[in-house]
């Protein structure tokens, strides 16, 4: 990986994280029961990553080098900082486009359940250390 790509990911990721923070702060007073800001980040991020994937595939606006830079800055960087859920959603889309419906369903189930179990496990491991 080149230094330029690393910098692009870092710059994009920083701006994505700031955007996520701003959105969660802006929506914090709207709902106390659900994390509306994160929900919106996941939905908006998924919409944008789908649009960017199609745009970079279908248009010839950028040459291959520029397209790579745009992808690392905006998709890997910005959307990675804004939400990692968007990458998960793009992976599901790719599986569905290849006709791998059952693999996509399994991937969704395993990802969500394993992540939930990991969060619970991590939480209780640390809570056990501090008790």
Regions found by a protein language model. Name each.
Residues 1-131:
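Membrane-interface helix-loop junctions in multi-pass transporters/channels
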């Amino acid at each position: 990986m080149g230094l330029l790509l690393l910098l692009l990911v870092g710059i994009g990721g920083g701006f994505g994280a700031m955007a996520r923070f701003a959105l969660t702060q802006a929506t914090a007073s709207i709902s106390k029961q659900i994390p509306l800001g994160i929900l919106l980040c996941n939905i908006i991020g998924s919409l944008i990553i789908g649009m960017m994937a199609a745009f970079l595939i279908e248009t010839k606006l950028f040459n291959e080098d520029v397209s790579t830079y745009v992808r690392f800055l905006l998709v890997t960087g910005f959307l990675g900082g804004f939400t990692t859920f968007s990458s998960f959603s793009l992976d599901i889309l790719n599986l569905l486009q290849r006709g791998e419906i059952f693999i996509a369903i399994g991937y969704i189930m395993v990802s969500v359940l394993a992540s939930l179990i990991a969060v619970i496990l991590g939480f209780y491991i640390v809570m056990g250390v501090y008790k």
